[in-house]
Amino acid sequence: MESLASLYKNHIATLQERTRDALARFKLDALLIHSGELFNVFLDDHPYPFKVNPQFKAWVPVTQVPNCWLLVDGVNKPKLWFYLPVDYWHNVEPLPTSFWTEDVEVIALPKADGIGSLLPAARGNIGYIGLVQERALQLGIEASNINPKGVIDYLHYYRSFKTEYELACMREAQKMAVNGHRAAEEAFRSGMSEFDINIAYLTATGHRDTDVPYSNIVALNEHAAVLHYTKLDHQAPEEMRSFLLDAGAEYNGYAADLTRTWSAKSDNDYAQLVKDVNDEQLALIATMKAGVSYVDYHIQFHQRIAKLLRKHQIITDMSEEAMVENDLTGPFMPHGIGHPLGLQVHDVAGFMQDDSGTHLAAPAKYPYLRCTRILQPGMVLTIEPGIYFIESLLAPWREGQFSKHFNWQKIEALKPFGGIRIEDNVVIHENNVENMTRDLKLA
């Protein structure tokens, strides 16, 4: 297996090539990429947790240090000014010496406002990529060159195609997240609260709650019907019925995003439904290949949902085709089948059809689908179908011509379990699909 250092060297070569092409297309000399800055809580003297600019961590695995700068031109070795203040109030990260530092020129930046004297004098044709636009203006960057849309669209489009270095990092993130899921299931089985299950997860992954790539969804019982439930009750429920965990990890800035659902008992209808959703998810992944629209797989899973609704007699006296045609599957799976994954959990360019940023929206029937791309080798996506029992979505169906097809008694019996979601992270290759999650034996 190639070392991370050799993979990184090739990764940088790829980023340099993309940068050269972008600069030539948009007639710029270089890009100045800002890691970001700390911002204080309103009327307070402590900052919000720092989140690095994803375009910055695409180049270097520096994710916790504000006030850093990268200058890249696609030709010369990337230059990193690494913030290294004299500070006895806060932790100061040492100047990095790691697998990646041979391929980047690393320079200490002792003062956050000292970058101006270190940059090239002629800056009118440098593009700035970052959050703090006023800082770019102070440095003499032209307003039209601050986050230039064409450049960002171009870079975002090609971020869809992961380098071997990026895939190696994402496989490591998978390992961390899988460890967390196993620890969380054990905590659930022992009767812990959502709050304590979350602590078990973070401990197993080696993350703080500000390190995970998104807020963990730790949902017991009916809380599993809230798609992005992040409350974390401190008290365990009197009766444990179900547990939905949607939680990831991050390695060198790259995310994992996994979901599993467990039934407290193995011999009820809900447990069988969990198994069936899992089986259908795996069956869908087995059909995936390059050259097919991601939208097609979303639509196909609605057909699989219809099959399960009929099997479990949740919808009765209606064909599977009619269920999908009339959107009776919609209230049971109101989100998309998944999304691109990478430096960001909901990674960029899900709707871009080319490197000019041409946008193809989700189908009107499925507005929450986050990707309309044709699958190509190098893409990484989540596949995360679900079935939920959400009253606000079911309520409109309680009246009207289709109400009689809903088995309301069965639905009421399943509502206390909340819902089900099963999520794996897959890589599209030329001749196969790699399931990074199942390769680690996470059931």
UniProtKB/Swiss-Prot annotation:
Q: What does the UniProt cofactor note say?
A: Binds 2 manganese ions per subunit.
- According to its record, what are the GO cellular component terms? cytosol
* Residues annotated to bind Mn(2+) 1: D257, H339, E384, E423
Biological process (GO) annotations held by this record are:
proteolysis
Q: Which cofactor does it need?
A: Mn(2+)
Per UniProt, where does Mn(2+) 2 bind?
Answer: D246, D257, E423
Report which reactions are catalysed by this protein: Xaa-L-Pro dipeptide + H2O = an L-alpha-amino acid + L-proline
- By its UniProt entry, which Pfam families does this protein fall under? PepQ_N, Peptidase_M24
- Give the matching InterPro entries: Creatin/AminoP/Spt16_N, Creatinase/aminopeptidase-like, PepQ_N, Pept_M24, Peptidase_M24B_aminopep-P_CS, X-Pro_dipept-like, X_Pro_dipept
GO terms assigned for molecular function: aminopeptidase activity; metal ion binding; metalloexopeptidase activity; phosphoric triester hydrolase activity; proline dipeptidase activity
What's the Enzyme Commission number for this chain? 3.4.13.9
Q: Which UniProt keywords apply?
A: Dipeptidase, Hydrolase, Manganese, Metal-binding, Metalloprotease, Protease
Tell me the HAMAP family matching this sequence: X_Pro_dipeptid (MF_01279)
Q: Which family does it belong to?
A: Belongs to the peptidase M24B family. Bacterial-type prolidase subfamily.
The role this protein plays is: Splits dipeptides with a prolyl residue in the C-terminal position.
Q: Which protein, by its recorded name, is this?
A: Xaa-Pro dipeptidase
Q: Native species of this protein?
A: Shigella flexneri serotype 5b (strain 8401)
Gene responsible for this protein: pepQ
